[in-house]
């Protein structure tokens, strides 16, 4: 699970950095929020943002300092919060659940850094021993992130009628009139929302494998319908988290049961 999360976080940041170097116009409102002009954003700051994100991805992959994992988590939350801050809605924040849930799960798994500043600047290599509390907390960070991204993506369809969803349906030969007449957008949205709730309630292996297949299909529709490939790459948490939860299920169950047994009885 450690290496899966580590590689996943690295790819997430490499993909996000790629978007910055590509000077994605979708980022302009986020810079405008801080009074930065479109010209300055496109000519300078997008390159800087992209370069920093790529550096973070490479550091996580080759030299994973704990402080870098903390940055990855905080930056994931911050960039996700920018979406509702510029009026894009809270579903956007939820849909980025993998962007902050995945690095948080990794940070918790390696034990964080505690109150020691020096420890934060040490490598977060694969731990030889992980406490039961850390196993359980890491599991829930990953599970919560996966549930949120499913619920957020479902909200796009059920409540916001995102225009690019019609392109997804068109890819399968369904025009807008058919989609609206059959309420397919609402059905799809609520299906994903309920899928996210199901992950929170009982994350069984069959459910998680289905979620993996579902997210691979729905996110591959982005490049297949004309969106930039980095939109698929930077959402690798959508695919890494269900695998991580399946692989770590046994360890999580043992840790959870030991913690329950250690609680004092009244």
Task: Give the role of each language-model region.
Residues 1-25, 39-56, 61-162, 178-194, ...:
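Extended, low-polarity transmembrane helix blocks
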Residues 28-42, 168-179:
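Perimembrane loop-to-helix junctions flanking transmembrane segments
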Residues 165:
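Functional cleft and adjacent loop/helix regions within the main domain
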């Amino acid at each position: 699970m450690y290496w899966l999360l580590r590689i996943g976080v690295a790819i997430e940041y490499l993909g996000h950095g790629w978007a910055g170097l590509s000077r994605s116009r979708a980022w302009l409102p986020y810079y405008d929020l801080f009074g930065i002009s479109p010209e300055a954003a496109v000519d300078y700051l997008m390159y800087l943002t992209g370069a920093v994100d790529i550096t973070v991805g490479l550091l996580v992959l080759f030299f994973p300092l704990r402080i870098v994992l903390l940055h990855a988590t905080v930056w994931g939350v911050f960039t996700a919060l920018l979406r509702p801050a510029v009026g894009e809605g809270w579903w956007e924040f939820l849909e980025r659940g993998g962007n902050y849930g995945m690095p948080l799960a990794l940070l918790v798994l390696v034990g964080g850094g505690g109150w020691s500043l020096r420890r934060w600047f040490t490598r977060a290599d694969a731990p030889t021993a992980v406490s039961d509390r850390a196993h359980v907390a890491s599991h829930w960070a990953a599970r919560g992130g996966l549930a949120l991204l499913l619920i957020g993506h479902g909200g796009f369809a059920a409540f916001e009628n995102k225009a690019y969803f019609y392109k997804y349906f068109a890819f399968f030969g369904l025009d807008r009139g058919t989609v609206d007449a059959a309420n397919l957008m609402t059905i799809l949205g609520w299906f994903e929302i309920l899928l996210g709730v199901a992950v929170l309630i009982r994350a069984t292996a069959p459910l998680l494998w289905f979620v993996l297949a579902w997210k691979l299909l729905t996110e591959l529709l982005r490049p297949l319908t004309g969106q930039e490939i980095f939109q698929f790459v930077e959402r690798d948490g959508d695919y890494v988290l269900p695998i991580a939860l399946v692989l770590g299920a046994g360890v999580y169950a043992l840790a959870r049961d030991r913690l329950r047994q250690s609680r004092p009885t009244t």
